[in-house]
Structure formats: C-alpha cells, structure tokens
C-alpha cells in the first residue's frame, strides 16, 4: 500500500513538473486572418508538427486568430492582446494590412515581429523583420501564364479577389494583370493583348466561401460568353459542394474550354475539383511549410541572427499537361 502511495505521489509530481515546464515555455505566436479558412489550418498543422519535433525546446508555437476571416478588427485586437500579455515573437498574416501596421507602429513592440502568408504594404515593411510565405506577385504571373496558354487570343475575364486591403491578394492581381497585358502597372484590363475585364469585376469575397460561390454563379449568369474566371485565392473551392453545384451549370463550357477556370491554392478539395474537371489549372501555395518554418525563423530573430527578407516558400503549378502536385494530393 505504501509503495502504491509513493508511486501515485511520483506520478503527480511528474505531471506537475510537466505542467510547470509547459507554463515556463516562451510563446512564438502565429496570428492568421481567420480560423474559419481551411488554408490557415494547414499553417496550424505545420506549427503543430514543429511542436511535436521540438518537445524539449524552451519555446512553444501558438496558432490563433479571429473566428471569422471577415473580422479585421478582431485580428488587430488579438495581436494587441498577445503583445500586452507578452510573447517572445509574433508572426502575423494581416487581413487589413494598413490597420495592422498602424497598430504595430503605435505599440512599438520590443520583440521580433514578422509577417507570414500576407505582408504589410511596402511603405510599412520596416515595422517587421521579414516576410515568410508566397511570392504573391509571382503567383499572379503563373496564373496569367496558364490563362495565356489556354486562351492565346485573350478574351473576357473576371478576377475574384479576397479582402480589398489584403496586400498578398492585391500583389497576385497585379502579377496577373501585368503579365497577361504585357504592361506594368495595369489597374484594369481593357483590351490589352486581347483581354478585358467584364463589368462588375473584380469581385471581392471578403474571404467567405459562400459569397465566393454566389459571385461565381452571378457572373456566369450575367456573362454567358465569359472566357475566363480567375480565382486569385481558393475561396469558392473551399466549399466543395457549393462549388460543384456552381460549376455543374457551366460544365459543358469547361469541357470545351469555352470557359476556363484558374484558381489559387491546392488544398485537397481543390485538387479533387481539378481532377474532376472543375478547373483547368491550380497554382498552389505551401501553407504547411509556412507554419512549420515560422517558429525557427522567430527563434533566429530572437537570437539576433541574420534572416533573409523575404523568405519565399515556393509554388506548385497544376495543369492538364502536368498534373504535378494535384495528381495524388
């Protein structure tokens, strides 16, 4: 009985020691635009993998963000709260880049601040140490290249964007327009190289999958002769059932390539949509890699080590000639 009691005491002591160790860990925070977006869950999985491989580290990776991707003010408040509470470093994917930068400027934190997935506007980049994520301008370039192969003579096009103030989305749109027009600094396609944006476009999803699918349906109805629909981000495809219903209405056009769809990202529902013929090309980011690499980048910054700026995580391009990443993922 005595030995059993001693064993219980030892187990309790071990648990308390483990809890104390967890409490003493320093926090590396990753704040995303919204927990409702499956893209960001991949960043979380990368963060969790880092945790599983670094159990003895003095640091822990914390993934957080507002419940909804539409809650820009909520994201700013979360960053504010974390900096007030005290974290060792923070990586932010700003939904509203100017608003987030303004708050960072006001707080003037002494800890390392970096951006992940989405950057601050160019004028505000001195507020962060580095950016880790996609070369978003290049992503737009790649999407344009796919469109040019599929529609060499050009045509009518609609761009679907996310949040009006999201720097990453705007950079992709710029890369697309510059490349497909053959001109720099094009705000809207009006016949350059045969491409014109239809009335009512671009459309902004505010990162909402249901709205994204409704917008697609409305644009298809209003523009029976539309040549290309470009999902600059994956929003509509994040709701696969709704996306299937929308694309069912134009499946004959998709098969004949009278209408082409090119979409950003390569999450599992999206690669399935591609294999099902519901898009002609996917240009994918690597969010898992972002979440996995971010803690080590933050630790380097804490230690005063030199870190490249930016740190690009690469792209995966899928098309009918080379299914690539989309073939089996």
Model-derived features: positions:
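Bacterial N-terminal signal peptides
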Residues: 8-14
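Bacterial N-terminal signal peptides that target proteins for export
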Residues: 1-8
């Amino acid at each position: 009985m005595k030995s059993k009691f001693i064993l219980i005491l030892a187990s309790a002591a071990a648990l308390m020691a483990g809890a104390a160790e967890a409490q003493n860990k320093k926090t590396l925070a990753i704040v995303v635009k919204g927990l409702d977006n499956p893209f960001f869950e991949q960043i979380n999985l990368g963060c969790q993998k880092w945790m599983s491989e670094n159990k003895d580290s003095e640091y822990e990776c914390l993934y957080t963000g507002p419940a909804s991707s539409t809650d820009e003010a909520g994201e700013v408040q979360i960053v504010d709260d974390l900096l007030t509470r005290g974290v060792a470093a923070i990586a932010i994917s700003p939904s509203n880049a100017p608003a987030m930068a303004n708050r960072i400027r006001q707080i003037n934190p002494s800890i390392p601040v970096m951006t992940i997935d989405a950057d601050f506007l160019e004028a505000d980049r001195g507020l962060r140490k580095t950016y880790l994520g996609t070369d978003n301008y290049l992503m737009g370039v790649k999407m344009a290249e796919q469109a040019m192969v599929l529609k060499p003579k050009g045509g009518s096009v609609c761009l679907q964007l996310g949040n009006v103030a999201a720097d990453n989305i705007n950079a992709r749109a710029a890369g697309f327009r510059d490349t497909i027009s053959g001109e720099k600094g094009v705000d809207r396609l009006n016949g350059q190289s045969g491409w014109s944006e239809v009335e009512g476009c671009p459309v902004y999803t505010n990162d909402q999958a249901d709205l994204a699918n409704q917008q697609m349906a409305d644009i298809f109805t209003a523009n029976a002769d539309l040549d290309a629909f470009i999902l600059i981000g994956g929003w509509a495809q994040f709701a696969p059932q709704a996306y299937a219903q929308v694309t069912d209405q134009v499946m004959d056009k998709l098969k004949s390539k009278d209408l082409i769809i090119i979409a950003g990202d390569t999450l599992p529902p999206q690669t399935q949509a591609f294999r099902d013929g519901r898009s002609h090309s996917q240009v994918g980011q690597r969010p898992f890699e972002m979440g996995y690499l971010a803690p080590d980048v933050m630790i380097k910054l804490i230690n005063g080590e030199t870190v490249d700026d930016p740190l690009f995580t690469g792209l995966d391009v899928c098309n009918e000639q080379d299914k690539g990443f989309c073939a089996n993922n």
